């Protein structure tokens, strides 16, 4: 074993500090060095990825020098993400330990992960994922006209029953996440299929602004979210208790590190838990949410098996919203998993401690894989 790890980053982007690195990268590098390991950062750009010889140069260097890689590339920072994933996949095939494996990034990080978990305690059974036929074929999903993955056939049915949330797969900070409800709240449950001229109110999580639209026109607008590789929409029940806050668990591999309580702005149609939209964040110890933590950790084996049986990501988050069960008791619903490039720069006092824990986890993962 070489006792050597490479961190992959993308040049540029709003997630970088003045030194050009992500703010949480060098603390992890230094934590590994303090344990007697070598750690280096290699940058990717779209130009490098498009250039086969440059791409291969990084591959050969990484294969020769390192036991594993840690991917610190934010979704959207590289247009050539597919080529980047190809490099990572090739490195995993060559024996490097992927943190995470690119297919695990897709499995855990794509919004349709929720539909793979809908027959568990975590996700409501009426959660659906919509694709264009070509994208469904590319990712191995069976698409049929009028079937469960057909957006325009299904959304008028799900919305007829109650308020929904539509989430695009790409984007961040709430862009392309819409709360959709009928203008006439008394009309739910009256028909199985809403007509296309049904008047609806759409609120975007980006900034909580609302728009009055017609159902057919809004669905036409949403087709942009289905275009291209990884294009999809996830359709979920709207949970009104989001007003009480979203609960995010930051995980290091199998260990919860802290919990963020994200309370949406007060008033109006606000439902977004993003800072940009005015949500307030509070950072808690895992023990402050012990019942949620214990329940979630008990679900990890099933989550792992249903999302492709890849190892858990190195750094990842799970977001929960409160709901009420049929007996009137609290229950938690999984709203999203993030794993592509989760940061831990806030709160600042946690960063060094978490970086040391990440270093310990990297060593444990690599040593376990190399045995």
Predicted regions and their residues:
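Extreme N-terminal starter segment of soluble prokaryotic enzymes
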Residues: 1-6
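Conserved N-proximal alpha/beta basic substrate-recognition cap immediately N-terminal to
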Residues: 12-146, 153-154
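C-terminal active-site "lid" helix and adjoining low-complexity regulatory extension at the edge
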Residues: 287-294, 298, 304-317, 321-371
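Short hydrophobic segments within beta-strands
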Residues: 7-10, 252
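Phosphate-binding site of ATP-dependent enzymes
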Residues: 162, 170-306, 333
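Short, solvent-exposed loop/turn segments at secondary-structure junctions
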Residues: 12-13, 47, 75-76, 105, ...
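Structural motif
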Residues: 69-72, 165, 234
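Domain-scale recognition of functional cores that engage charged ligands
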Residues: 78-79, 100-118, 126-154, 159, ...
């Amino acid at each position: 074993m070489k006792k050597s790890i490479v961190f992959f980053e993308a040049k540029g982007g709003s997630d970088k500090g003045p030194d050009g690195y992500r703010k949480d990268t060098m603390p992890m590098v230094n934590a590994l060095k303090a344990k007697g390991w070598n750690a280096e950062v290699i940058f990717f750009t779209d130009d490098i990825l498009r250039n086969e010889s440059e791409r291969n140069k990084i591959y050969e260097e990484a294969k020769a020098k390192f036991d594993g890689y840690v991917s610190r590339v934010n979704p959207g920072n590289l247009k050539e993400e597919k080529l980047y994933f190809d490099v990572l996949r090739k490195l995993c095939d060559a024996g490097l330990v992927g943190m995470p494996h690119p297919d695990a990034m897709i499995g855990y990080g794509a919004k349709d992960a929720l539909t793979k978990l809908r027959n568990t305690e975590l996700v409501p059974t009426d959660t659906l994922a919509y694709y264009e036929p070509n994208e469904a074929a590319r990712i191995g999903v069976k698409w049929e006209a009028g079937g469960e993955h057909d957006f325009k056939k299904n959304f008028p049915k799900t919305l007829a029953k109650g308020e929904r949330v539509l989430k695009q797969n790409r984007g961040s900070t709430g862009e392309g996440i819409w709360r959709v409800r009928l203008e006439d709240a008394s009309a739910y449950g009256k028909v199985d299929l809403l007509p296309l001229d049904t008047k609806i109110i759409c609120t975007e999580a980006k900034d909580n602004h609302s728009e009055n639209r017609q159902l057919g026109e809004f669905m036409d607008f949403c087709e942009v979210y289905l275009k291209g590789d990884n294009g999809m929409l996830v359709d979920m029940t709207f949970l009104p208790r989001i007003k009480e806050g979203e609960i995010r668990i930051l995980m290091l591999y199998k260990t919860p590190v802290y919990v963020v309580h994200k309370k949406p702005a007060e008033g109006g149609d606000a439902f977004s838990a993003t800072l940009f939209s005015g949500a307030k964040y509070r950072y808690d110890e895992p023990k402050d949410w012990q019942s949620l933590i214990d329940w979630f950790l008990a679900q990890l084996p099933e989550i792992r098996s249903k999302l492709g049986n890849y190892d858990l990501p190195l750094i990842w988050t799970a977001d929960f919203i409160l709901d009420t069960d049929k007996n009137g008791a609290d229950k938690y619903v999984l709203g999203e998993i993030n794993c592509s490039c989760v940061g831990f720069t806030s709160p600042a006092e946690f960063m060094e401690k978490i970086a040391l824990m990440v270093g310990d986890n990297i060593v444990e993962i690599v040593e376990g894989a190399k045995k």
